Amino acid sequence: MAQNFAIYPKKIEEDPQVAEAKKKVEATKPTPEEKQAAAEAEVDALVARAKKALVEFENLDQKQVDRIVAKASIAALNKHLVLAKMAVDETGRGLVEDKATKNIFACEHVTNYLAGQKTVGIIREDDVMGIDEVAEPVGVVAGVTPVTNPTSTAIFKSLIALKTRCPIVFGFHPGAQKCSVEAAKIVRDAAIEAGAPENCIQWIEHPSIQATGALMQHPGVATILATGGPGMVKAAYSSGKPALGVGAGNAPAYVDSDVDIVRAANDLVLSKHFDYGMICATEQAIIAHKDVYDQLIKELKVRKAYFVNAEEKAKLEQYMFGCTAGSGVKPVLNSAVPGKSPQFIAKAAGFEIPADATILAAECKEVSDDEPLTHEKLAPVQAVLKADNKEQAFEMCEKMLKLGAGHTAAIHTNNQELVREYGVRMHACRIIWNQPSSLGGIGDIYNAIAPSLTLGCGSYGGNSVSGNVQAVNLVNIKRIARRNNNMQWFKIPAKTYFEPNAIKYLRDMYGIEKAVIVCDKVMEQLGIVDKIIDQLRARSNRVTFRIIDYVEPEPSVETVEKGAEMMREEFEPDTIIAVGGGSPMDASKIMWLLYEHPEIAFSDVREKFFDIRKRAFKIPPLGKKAKLVCIPTSSGTGSEVTPFAVITDHKTGYKYPITDYALTPSVAIVDPVLARTQPRKLASDAGFDALTHSMEAYVSVYANDFTDGMALHAAKLIWDNLAESVNGEPGLAKTNAQEKMHNAATMAGMAFGSAFLGMCHGMAHTIGALCHIAHGRTNSILLPYVIRYNGQIPEEPTSWPKYNKYIAPERYQDIARNLGIDTGKTPAEAVENLAKAVEDYRDNKLGMNKSFQDCGVDEDYFWSVLDQIGMRAYEDQCTPANPRIPLINDMKDIAVGAYYGVSQAEGHKLRIEREGEAATEEASER
C-alpha cells in the first residue's frame, strides 16, 4: 500500500547572536496593555488642552471668528497642490490634480458657504414671535478622517470647527498620517496667527486603533465627526457620544430613455474617473433603459471607457472581490483597490488595457452578491446594466441602495416628474439629477446642496444626519423665548341684520336660486316657515326650495347626515336657511359641512382642542357651494353668530359641541318678531342660556377687550328684560323686552363665539344629554355653583399666556356691579352675592326648577351616570376655557349638590358616603 510522507526541511540552527538580538527587541516591544495606556495618556493630554482652548474661544466674537476662518482657508488654499501630491505619494491612491481640486473645494466652496453664517452669540432675533437664538459650540470634537480623502477632509473639518469655536482633535488614518498632519498644521498655524487659541486644532501623533478608540470614548469629547467605512461609523456610534458619522455608498445612476445621452455619458465618465472613484457619492452602477442602452455604451466608449470581455470580467471580479459572478461567495472588496488607476487594477487582475483608458466598465445581469461589481468599489470600475422598463430600473436602483443605504442615487433624464418619482421612491439622502454624482453629492459645484466632505446617510444608513454635514451640526442652539400673548380673534358672520321684520332681507339677498329650509315641525306649525317662503316668493327671481323639517330638539348625527345627503344627491342648493332655535341652526351647520365636504368624518371634527387655530383637524373653508343663513326664533343659543354646533351621537350618548370658525354662518337675521311666539318655559330656558353665555364669556381665559363689552352689555340687557319678556302682559313693554332679549342673545353669542365658554356649559351638555333636561334649565341650576367654584382661588388655574393672574373673582365682581348687585367689600363677597342673586332670579322671578331632582331625574339613575358626568364634562370642548381647571371629582360634587339642591361641599360629603357604601357592598360581594 502506498504511503503518504510529509517531507520536512532540515532544521537550520539559528545564529546565537541573531536570537539574542530578537529577544531584546521582543523585550522592548510594548504589551497591548502598555499600548492602551500610552494611547489613553496621549489622548488625555490632547483633550485637556482642547478644553482649555474651548474656554479661550469664548472670548472671540463673530468678526474675529470669521477672520480666523478666512485666514486659515487661504493658507490651506496656498498649499492645495503640495498637499495633494503628499496625499498621493503617501497613500498611493488617487490623482494629484483631482485631490488638488478637492482641497480647493474644501478651502473655497466651504468657506464661501460659511461666509455670513452666524455661529457666535445671538444668531437670530425674531421680535414678532419673541424668539432669540443663541449659538454655542458643542464642545471638543473628535475628528476621524479616511485614507481616501485625507487632506481635503482634514481641511474641511478644521474649518467648520473653527467657524463654530469647537476645538478639534484628529485621529487620522494611519495610512495618511503625514499628509493629514501637514494639512491640519497649515490650517492650525494660520488660525493661531489670526487669533485662534493655541490648541484649536490637534491630532494624535502616534495613530492606532487604541488611540482613536480612546479619543472617541473620552469623557471630555462632546461629539464625534467621523468619516470612513461602516466599521468606523459603527465604532463612532458605539462610543456613547453624539456622533456625526457617515457610511458606505453604493450609488446607482439611472439613465432614462428621455435623456441627453451625450451629456449623460460625459458626466458618468467624468464622475467615475475623478480621483479614481474615491468620493463615496460616486456612481457604482449605471442602469440604462433598453432604448438608449446601446447608444450609451457607444458614447461611453467614445470617452475611452474600456468594456471588459467575459474572461476579463471574471479576472476583475476575482481580484477586486475574491470571487466571480455566480460563485455563491459573498464579495469582500480588496483594500488595495480603492483609488488605483484603471491600468493598475487591470494589470493586477491579469490583463492589459490601453494607457489612455479612463475607466473600466463591465456589463452585468443583475444587482446582487452574484454580481460582485455591483457593490461599492471606490475605484474607476463601473458596472453597467440594462433595464427593460422604468419599473425594472427602479427595482435595480433600490437593490443597489440596499448595499449602501441612504447615501446617494443619481438619475439622468429630461422628465422632471420622473425625477420626483425617483426621489420619493429611492432610500437615498441625495438625489443627483443630470450631474456627475461624485461632484454633485459633495454639493455646491453642480447644485445648491451644502458643500461638505462628510455626507450623511440618515436613518437608512444608521446615521444621525441625513444632509451634508456642515457648521450648523457643531453648534448648540439655545432659544430665549419671550412670553407671548397668543393672537386672538373676533369672528362673526360677514352680515348680521336686526330690527323687527328683518327677514325681508331674504327678498334682496344676492344669489338665492335654490334654497333648503332647515327647521323642526314646530316652526311649520307656528307658520314661521311660511313667512320665510313668502320672502323667497317675493324676490324678483324664481326660487326653488326644499324643506328639512325633521330636526330633533337634540339634533343627531343621523339627522345631519341625512340632510346633507339630500342636499348632495337630490337638490344641490346654493343657500341653506336655518330657522328656529339652536337645534335647527346647529344641525344646518353640520349639514352645510357634510354637503360641501362629504369626505369629512364626524368623528374627526368632534375632537377636543385647546387652541382653535392649532386644532389637530382643521375644517376647510365653507361657502363654495352654498351660503348659510341663520334666523333664530328663540332668544338664547346665539348659534346664528357662533362657530359652535352641538350635535348628539346616540350611539355613544355624547352631546358634542363642534367648534370651528368655518362653521360661522354667512348671514344672521335677528328678527325679534319671530321670537314673540316663544312659550314661557322655552323663553325662561333660552334666556338663562344666554345669561350663562355672557357670564362665562366674560370670565373665560380667552376674554378680551372686543368680547368684554358685548358680554357685559348682553348680561345687563338680559338681567333687565328676561323677567318681563317671560312674565309680562301682552303689550309694548313686553314687546320691547322681547326685542332686547333677542338682541342680547345674539350679542352674548358674539361674545362667546370668540371668548368661548366654560365648565357650566361643559357640564350642561353632559347632564342634559344623559338626564334629558333642557339645556337652558340645566345651565340655570348649575350657574350659581360654577360662580362659587370659579370665585375661589384654585389649586390649578387654566394656563393661557394672557391670563397672567387669576382674576375670576374680580370678573364676577364686575358682572355684579354691572347688574346693580351689591358687590360687598371684597371680590369674595361679590361672588357670593352674585350667586345668590342668580338663584333668586331663577327661583322667584322665573319660577324655574331649583335642582335636577326637581326636574324629575330618577335618583338611582343619576348616581349610576355620575362617573360619566365627571368624565364627559371634562372632555367637553367648552371646559378648556374655564378660568379654573375643573377637576373631575369637583364636577361630580357640583352635580350631586345640584341634584339635591345643596352646596358643593354637601354634595362632596354625599358622594364620598355613597362611594364608601358602594365599595363596602362590592367587597362583601367578593
Regions found by a protein language model. Give the residues of each.
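N-terminal Rossmann-like NAD(P)+-binding subdomain of aldehyde/semialdehyde dehydrogenases
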Residues: Q3-D132, I160, V302
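ALDH superfamily catalytic-core signature
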Residues: K29-P30, A37, I155, V233-S368, ...
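Conserved C-terminal structural/oligomerization subdomain of aldehyde/semialdehyde dehydrogenase
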Residues: T31, E58, F351-N486
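Glycine/threonine-rich beta-strand-loop-alpha-helix active-site module
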Residues: N112-L114, A183, E558-V673
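Rossmann-like NAD(P) dinucleotide-binding subdomain of oxidoreductase/dehydrogenase enzymes
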Residues: I122-R263
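ATP/NTP phosphate-donor binding region
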Residues: M487-T575, F852
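Carboxylate- and glycine-rich phosphate/diphosphate-binding segment that chelates Mg2+/Mn2+
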Residues: V641-A755
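Gly/Pro-rich interdomain helix-loop hinge
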Residues: L770-S864, P880, Q904, L910-E913
